[in-house]
């Protein structure tokens, strides 16, 4: 019996395609809003053409040990030489990524109310347990619905400092704190296949100078230092067209966002099929020790997974 099962739905009737599966991956990729599944299958199953069952926009689900780990629709279907079929499937968030709309929100609304309004227009159930902030005026013109949601959350994150996560859970869009709750799994050296831990000073800022003087000599008004132990890498904030208070806020934000080297952590290990983007894991292997947030994860039918991680920080979860 395979640990993974694949079902496509004809109305309410599930059709088991597991025996046709040759290759299977699923998960939440960093930089992609919608969860994705990629399947490679035999074009015929039980004497019938797979195309009779697997149609574009047909609901599809993947189960691991009897528990659903992916639910979406067939988005891309390719028949190759009449023998194999490649399918790319996404969850419902793909419709928000592929749909453009315009929306206006007056100043004074909090993040929850903005997202509730956007989701209501698109018949998307919302579970919200993120912190958020009070927003200024928001105007979205001919932007994808997904972009409106992400832009709103990015603005809130910049103000409150709490990292957010969003993902589909059982037909509901869940917006919450990244890394909330207890670690989902413990990746020790016994479960580890490989890892890459990279630190990069590109884009690092250790000092910010605030300047004025748009029409005359440039004057340095203030200097903010971060961690200069790695040397001086300076950014300049021009306060000529803004208040000094706003310039100070921008300088502090630069040091928060870019004041430490960029860290890239990739881990391959034995699978935890239910692990999702936004979950927290514990890792103890080589230079990695502690709790990490999952930025992206892909699982496969061979019961291994590839994760991209970020260090979990206090205040998240």
Predicted regions: what they are:
Residues 81-191, 195-197:
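Charged- and aromatic-enriched interaction segments used to assemble
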Residues 1-96, 184-196:
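Assembly/oligomerization scaffold segments
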Residues 19, 61-89, 165, 281-311:
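Short beta-strand and beta-hairpin "edge-sheet" elements
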Residues 41, 89-91, 177-179, 212, ...:
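Flexible glycine-/small-residue-rich
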Residues 2-7, 154, 163-300, 304, ...:
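Acidic, small/polar-enriched beta strand-loop surface segments
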Residues 106, 313-317:
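Glycine- and charge-enriched low-complexity intrinsically disordered segments
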């Amino acid at each position: 019996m395979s640990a993974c099962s694949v079902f496509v739905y004809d109305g309410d009737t599930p059709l088991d395609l597991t025996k046709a599966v040759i290759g299977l991956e699923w998960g939440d990729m960093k930089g992609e809003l919608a969860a994705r599944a990629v399947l490679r299958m035999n074009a015929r199953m039980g004497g019938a053409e797979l195309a009779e069952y697997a149609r574009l926009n047909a609901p599809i689900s993947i189960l691991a040990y009897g528990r659903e780990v992916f639910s979406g629709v067939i988005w891309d279907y390719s028949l190759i030489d009449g023998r194999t079929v490649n399918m790319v499937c996404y969850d419902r968030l793909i419709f928000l990524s592929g749909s453009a709309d315009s929306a206006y929100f007056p100043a004074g609304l909090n993040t929850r109310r903005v997202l509730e309004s956007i989701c209501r227009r698109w018949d998307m159930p919302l579970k919200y347990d993120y912190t958020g902030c009070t927003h200024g005026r928001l105007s979205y013109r001919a932007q994808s619905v997904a972009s409106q949601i992400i832009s709103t959350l990015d603005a809130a994150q910049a103000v409150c400092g709490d990292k957010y996560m969003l993902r589909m859970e059982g037909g509901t869009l869940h917006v919450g704190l990244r890394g909330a709750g207890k670690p989902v799994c413990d990746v020790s050296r016994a479960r580890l296949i490989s890892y890459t831990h990279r630190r990069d000073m590109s884009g690092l800022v250790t000092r910010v100078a605030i300047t004025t003087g748009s029409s005359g000599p440039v004057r340095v008004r203030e200097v903010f230092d971060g961690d200069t132990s790695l040397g001086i890498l300076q950014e300049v904030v021009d306060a000529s067209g803004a208040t000094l208070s706003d310039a100070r806020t921008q300088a502090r934000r630069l040091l928060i966002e870019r004041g430490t080297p960029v860290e890239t952590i990739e881990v391959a290990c034995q699978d935890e099929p239910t692990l999702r983007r936004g979950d927290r894991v514990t890792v103890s292997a080589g230079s990695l020790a502690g709790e990490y947030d999952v930025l992206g994860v892909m699982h496969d039918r061979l019961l291994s997974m590839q994760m991209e991680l970020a260090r979990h920080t206090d205040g998240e979860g």
